[in-house]
Structure formats: structure tokens, C-alpha cells
Design a protein with these regions (language model features):
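Conserved short histidine dyad/triad with adjacent acidic residue
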Residues: 20-37, 71-72
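Ligand-binding loop in jelly-roll beta-barrel domains
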Residues: 71-92
Length: 92
């Protein structure tokens, strides 16, 4: 599968109801505490990888892979040795 451009990805997630699309960059080894968001999130990792933990479930999300998080879901993130960059659409 070919990685879409930022504009193509933005159009895809806006079609799912996203109001905004952001570029998020995280440093190598960065970790977030458990938190939740007041929006649905649709992301595409474009560089690096991170581990997404929701309860007892962990998933490593790598370059070229997508993830979805529904609003109000408690989760944490741990970024790999290269850090990560992802594009994320937010649906309020």
C-alpha cells in the first residue's frame, strides 16, 4: 500500500467526520501518562513507531500503519528509539 499524501489523508479522515487534522511529532523514548481525549482520533504513522496501550491491550503501531481511538478511551503511548511522527484527524 502506498502512503497517501497529507492532503489525501486529510480528505479521508474529514470524510469520517474529523474537524481538524494535525501533524504530531514525538521524541525518542517519550512516554505519556494514561489519559483520554474528548474526540475520536484517526491516525497514520508516517515515521517511527509507538506502543499504544489501552487497559491490558498493547499494540505497536509502525510506519505506514493506522490506528483509531474513540473518545473517552483511557490510553498511554510509549515512543520507540526513533520517536514517531503521525498525522491525526480529530472528530469532536
Amino acid at each position: 500500500m502506498t502512503t497517501p499524501t497529507f492532503e489525501e489523508y486529510s480528505a479521508q479522515v474529514r470524510a469520517k467526520g474529523c474537524d481538524e487534522v494535525l501533524v504530531r511529532e514525538w521524541a525518542a523514548g517519550h512516554q505519556t501518562p494514561v489519559h483520554e481525549h474528548p474526540f475520536d482520533a484517526y491516525g497514520l504513522v508516517v515515521r517511527g513507531e509507538f506502543t499504544l496501550t489501552c487497559g491490558d491491550t498493547q499494540r505497536v503501531v509502525k510506519t505506514g500503519e493506522t490506528f483509531e481511538l474513540k473518545r473517552g478511551i483511557a490510553h498511554s503511548e510509549a515512543y520507540g528509539p526513533e520517536g514517531a511522527t503521525f498525522w491525526v484527524g480529530r472528530a469532536s
